[in-house]
């Protein structure tokens, strides 16, 4: 679908930038994970060890936490679209509900990233993964509920 108005063109450019950041962030994350897997395997092969030296789950959780923080900072920059951001029926109602929902969602994702990093540093990788999923689920639920509340306020105006 082609962007007809100048506003739609600006929104499309903004969304494209956010998608680019998402793609680059994921590529970096998987590249670092790949490096740690190869490095751990090399250490293990040379030492004749039976257990991995590096807990890849721990590295993955910390990287995911960093990605959440980065993406949370870019979430507020995305204009209303069908690809990036908090996309509920309520948040898509108008630009105001979109902006408020995505700002709140971004804060939740940043907090999720911080909590994931902190938790993973002090626990094992698998425990960190479980906590990360719990934090992400809670952030999603709270953001969707907030999106509905913003929508309800907007309808009453």
Where are these regions (language model features)?
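Feature 926 captures the class I aminoacyl-tRNA synthetase adenylation module centered on the KMSKS loop
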Residues: 1-157
């Amino acid at each position: 679908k082609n962007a007809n108005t100048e506003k739609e063109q600006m929104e499309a450019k903004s969304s494209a930038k956010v998608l680019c950041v998402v793609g680059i962030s994921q590529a970096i994350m998987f590249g670092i994970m790949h490096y740690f897997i190869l490095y751990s395997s090399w250490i293990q092969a040379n030492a004749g060890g039976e257990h991995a030296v590096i807990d890849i789950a721990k590295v993955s959780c910390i990287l995911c936490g960093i990605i959440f923080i980065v993406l949370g900072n870019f979430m507020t920059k995305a204009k209303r679209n069908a690809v990036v951001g908090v996309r509920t029926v309520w948040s898509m109602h108008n630009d105001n509900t979109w902006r408020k929902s995505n700002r709140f969602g971004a804060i939740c994702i940043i907090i999720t990233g911080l909590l994931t990093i902190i938790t993973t540093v002090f626990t094992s990788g698998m425990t960190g993964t479980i906590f990360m999923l719990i934090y992400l689920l809670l952030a999603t639920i709270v953001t969707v509920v907030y999106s509905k509340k913003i929508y309800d306020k907007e309808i009453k105006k």
